[in-house]
Amino acid sequence: AGRFDGRVRVNVLEIAGGSDLAERFQQSGTATAAPGTVMVIDEGNAGHLKVSDAAYDTKVAGIVSGAGDVQAGLTLEQEGVLEGDLTVAIAGRVYAQCEAHSGSIQPGDLLTTSSVAGHCMKATERTLAAGAIIGKAMTGLKSGQGLVLVLVSLQ
């Protein structure tokens, strides 16, 4: 491990310690944001995120990294300016808390926020889904609640 102050340039960089691209954020609200929790932009606190609690929320921002023992591969932060305690995946593969009450989730399904706090669900209403997609399911969930591997690709 090391710390470099200044510019580092490489031709190829392979990261073998995780599989998502994350940023650190400050969290608003009192809800617990455990690994796998779906987060949305907090309109009342610039730059902060809060636990999602509404279906088809266009403020969807990412998923807290670390669920299913999959850690962030690369974490971005600007010390003293844009920093926080919550590591949130904004791209790549990460496990998310999902619910299948609106329909079973299959690999390839588009996912959006759910009314169940901190969870995502299968996007079945295409008109509501525009701008509210967090990514695509890579594993399934037939019923109930559980972890689903998600390819995060905000849309």
Kindly label every feature range from the protein language model.
Residues A1-Q155:
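Extracellular receptor-binding modules and their adjoining Ser/Thr/Gly/Asp/Asn-rich linkers
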